[in-house]
């Protein structure tokens, strides 16, 4: 079996091109591939947009999180994205240095794994938010009696705990490795005696738990939600529903290439032409997955401008409007919110 002791992992940021047979084995300078250069440009854009954007969302939602369920959801999503964005400069430096990793073993285990933690945390949080939307529409009595900030924080803690458990393989298998040709220290994935079997198992679990299962369940959930919304057109606000749907769709769009490439690299033999082709495209797929870390603030701003009908709102005010709980119009009677914990907000906002 190929790569029995040290196998390629498609989250291995330091291995961009090092498995290519054309890689020089002496000390000659090798130029970065075009796909890697494009990936680096994307990383820069993600960092420049994602750090201030998510930090602003964290600031706005943290002020409302004690009393607003929606703010709790969006706060946790922003924290997950912000953690991944903050790790980008170190990963960027490693790629520029052709995979050299001078940051030590602990950083090797943690920093490249943050994108996987982000993936699992984001999809589990989105599933939790979707369940909240579903219950608000189909079980309003339960919401009136039970829904609150305490339960929302508990659900988020469970989501983060599960995400950490699912990221454990990446933490455990990542090690600092010594390359001989050319001599350098790299941060790689070593499956040891388990070899290809472990690599394939990790990739399959990642695909099923992190993509296919959520795609199916959320598709069913939002099909019912949208059908109910359309059948009662004009009876309730759909602001939050539209924002959440946009966030969910963007997640699956930007993570799809990563998941497809991961399965190709896990299942095919390294000597195959398709594998070598996948190695070249892999940096771009990883970069696209990182785009998901900066896209949510953009969605919130675009949605806020659409809902406000004006462009003069300050960003904090605009975000606060988009991410707050909603007032409800039911029939001809308007229920205005004095706080986000009113019965109308709890049981009718979609």
UniProtKB/Swiss-Prot annotation:
Q: Which residues are glycosylated?
A: 5
Does Membrane count among this protein's keywords? yes
Disulfide feature? 108-187
Provide the record's note on post-translational modification.
Sulfation plays a critical role in the association of C5aR with C5a, but no significant role in the ability of the receptor to transduce a signal and mobilize calcium in response to a small peptide agonist.
Where, per the database record, does this protein carry Phosphoserine?
Answer: 314, 317, 327, 332, 334, 338
Question: Sorted alphabetically, which InterPro entries does this protein's record hold?
Answer: Anphylx_rcpt_C3a/C5a1-2 (IPR002234), Formyl_rcpt-rel (IPR000826), GPCR_Rhodpsn (IPR000276), GPCR_Rhodpsn_7TM (IPR017452)
List the ranges whose topology is Extracellular: 1-36, 93-109, 174-200, 266-282
Q: Give the membrane topology, semicolon-separated if more than one.
A: Multi-pass membrane protein
Q: Which GO terms describe its molecular function?
A: complement component C5a receptor activity; G protein-coupled receptor activity
* Subcellular location as annotated: Cell membrane; Cytoplasmic vesicle
Keyword annotations of the record: Cell membrane, Chemotaxis, Cytoplasmic vesicle, Disulfide bond, G-protein coupled receptor, Glycoprotein, Membrane, Phosphoprotein, Receptor, Sulfation, Transducer, Transmembrane, Transmembrane helix
Residue ranges that the UniProt entry lists as topological domain Cytoplasmic: 64-68, 132-152, 227-242, 304-350
What is one Gene Ontology biological process annotated in the Swiss-Prot or TrEMBL record? inflammatory response
**Pfam families the record matches:** 7tm_1 (PF00001)
Transmembrane stretches in the record are 37-63, 69-92, 110-131, 153-173, 201-226, 243-265, 283-303
Q: What is its main location?
A: membrane
What does the entry list under GO cellular component?
A: apical part of cell; basolateral plasma membrane; cytoplasmic vesicle
Report the residues modified as Sulfotyrosine.
Answer: 10, 13
Per its database record, what is this protein's job? Receptor for the chemotactic and inflammatory peptide anaphylatoxin C5a. The ligand interacts with at least two sites on the receptor: a high-affinity site on the extracellular N-terminus, and a second site in the transmembrane region which activates downstream signaling events. Receptor activation stimulates chemotaxis, granule enzyme release, intracellular calcium release and superoxide anion production.
Family named by the database record: Belongs to the G-protein coupled receptor 1 family.
- Outline the subunit composition: Homodimer. May also form higher-order oligomers. Interacts (when phosphorylated) with ARRB1 and ARRB2; the interaction is associated with internalization of C5aR.
Quote the protein name from its UniProt record.
C5a anaphylatoxin chemotactic receptor 1
Q: State the organism named in the record.
A: Oryctolagus cuniculus (Rabbit)
């Amino acid at each position: 079996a190929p790569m029995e002791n040290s196998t390629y992992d498609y989250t291995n940021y330091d291995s961009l091109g090092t498995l290519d047979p054309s890689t020089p084995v002496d000390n000659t300078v090798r130029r970065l591939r075009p796909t890697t250069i494009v990936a680096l440009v994307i990383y820069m854009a993600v960092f420049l947009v994602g750090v201030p954007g998510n930090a602003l969302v964290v600031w706005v939602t943290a002020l409302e999180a004690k009393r607003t369920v929606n703010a709790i959801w969006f706060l946790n999503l922003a924290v997950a994205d912000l953690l991944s964005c903050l790790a980008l400069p170190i990963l960027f430096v490693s790629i520029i240095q052709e995979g050299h990793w001078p940051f030590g073993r602990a950083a090797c285990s943690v920093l490249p794994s943050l994108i996987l933690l982000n993936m699992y945390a984001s999809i589990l949080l989105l599933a939790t938010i979707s369940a909240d939307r579903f219950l608000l529409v189909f079980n309003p009595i339960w919401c009136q009696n039970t829904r609150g900030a305490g339960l929302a924080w508990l659900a988020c803690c469970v989501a983060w705990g599960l995400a950490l458990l699912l990221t454990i393989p990446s933490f455990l298998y990542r090690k600092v490795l010594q390359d001989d040709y050319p001599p350098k220290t790299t941060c790689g994935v070593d499956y040891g005696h388990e070899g290809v079997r472990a690599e394939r198992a990790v990739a399959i679990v990642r695909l099923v738990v992190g993509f296919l299962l959520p795609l199916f369940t959320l598709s069913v959930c939002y099909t019912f939600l949208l059908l109910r919304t359309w059948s009662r057109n004009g009876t309730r606000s759909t602001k939050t529903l539209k924002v959440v749907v946009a966030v969910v769709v963007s997640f699956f769009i930007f993570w799809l290439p990563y998941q497809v490439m991961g399965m190709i690299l896990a299942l095919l033999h390294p000597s195959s032409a398709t594998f070598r082709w996948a190695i070249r495209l892999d940096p771009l797929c990883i970069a696209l997955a990182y785009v998901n870390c900066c896209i949510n603030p953009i969605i919130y701003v675009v949605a806020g401008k659409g809902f406000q009908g004006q462009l003069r709102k300050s960003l904090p005010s605009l975000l606060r409007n988009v991410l707050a709980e909603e007032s409800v119009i039911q029939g001809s009677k308007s229920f205005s919110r004095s706080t986000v914990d009113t019965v109308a907000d709890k049981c009718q906002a979609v």
